[in-house]
Amino acid sequence: MRKTKVINTQISSVISDMGHFDTLSIGDAGMPVPVGTKKIDVAIENGVPSFIQVLTNILSELEVQKVYLANEIKTANPEQLAAIKALIGETPIEFIDHSQMKQDLNKAKAFVRTGEMTPYSNIILESGVVF
C-alpha cells in the first residue's frame, strides 16, 4: 500500500503520467466534462469531498508551475479564491473566462469531479518539473 497521501488509484495514475506543461483539472460537481476527457468522479454527496480537500491532496504530489482560474471566481466566490491562494502560495495564477476554462478541459489529462457545490470552484493545474 502507498505511503503517500494520494491513494485514489485513478488520480495517482494520472499524476504519475503528467509531463511538463500537461494539465489536470479539479472542479465542482456541476462542471461539464467534455467527451474524451477522462473524468475521475470522487463525489459522494453534496460537499463531500470538498474542492479544497481534493486540491490539497493533489498538490501534495503534483509539481505545479501555474494554475488557471475563472475570472468569475473573483466576485462569485471570493472565499474559495482566498483558500486557493493560501494553498498555492507563490504559484502564478492566470485568470480566464469560465467559457474558456470549459474549452480547455479538452486538453486536460483528466478532470477530477468533487462534491463541491459552490460556484466557479474549478481549477486547471499546469504541471511543472521537479528539477
UniProtKB/Swiss-Prot annotation:
It catalyses: beta-D-ribopyranose = beta-D-ribofuranose. GO terms for biological process: D-ribose catabolic process. Disulfide bonds: none annotated. The gene is rbsD. Belongs to the RbsD / FucU family. RbsD subfamily. Keywords: Carbohydrate metabolism, Cytoplasm, Isomerase. Its main location: cytoplasm. This is D-ribose pyranase. GO terms for molecular function: D-ribose pyranase activity; intramolecular lyase activity; monosaccharide binding. The keyword Aminoacyl-tRNA synthetase does not apply. It comes from Latilactobacillus sakei subsp. sakei (strain 23K) (Lactobacillus sakei subsp. sakei).
